Amino acid sequence: MASSLSFGSRFLIALIRGYQLVISPLLGPRCRFNPTCSQYGIEALRRFGVIKGCWLTVKRVLKCHPLHEGGDDPVPPVKNNDNREH
């Protein structure tokens, strides 16, 4: 599946994976959502490509704070394949 992703999507996914491996263990579990914001970002980038995937991820991270109740918040389904970058 990775071969069908754009360079930008693969690069951003690698950055998120780096965060998951290096920074996240130092901070401990903080995300209020399921899936976690980093996993959400990876799925959004895979599903929608760089532009929409980044937009969805930024919106999600901005909601992840103590005043928001959190809970289940999956990546929305793809309505058609025209939104996907190749």
Curated annotation (Swiss-Prot):
Cellular component terms (Gene Ontology): plasma membrane
Cellular compartment(s): Cell inner membrane
Membrane topology type: Peripheral membrane protein
Keywords for this protein: Cell inner membrane, Cell membrane, Membrane
InterPro entries: Membr_insert_effic_factor_YidD
Region (Disordered): 67-86
Statement: the UniProt record of this protein carries the keyword Cell inner membrane: yes
Transport found in the keyword field: no
Superkingdom of the source species: Bacteria
Function: Could be involved in insertion of integral membrane proteins into the membrane.
Family: Belongs to the UPF0161 family.
UniProt-recorded name of the protein: Putative membrane protein insertion efficiency factor
Organism for this UniProt entry: Photorhabdus laumondii subsp. laumondii (strain DSM 15139 / CIP 105565 / TT01) (Photorhabdus luminescens subsp. laumondii)
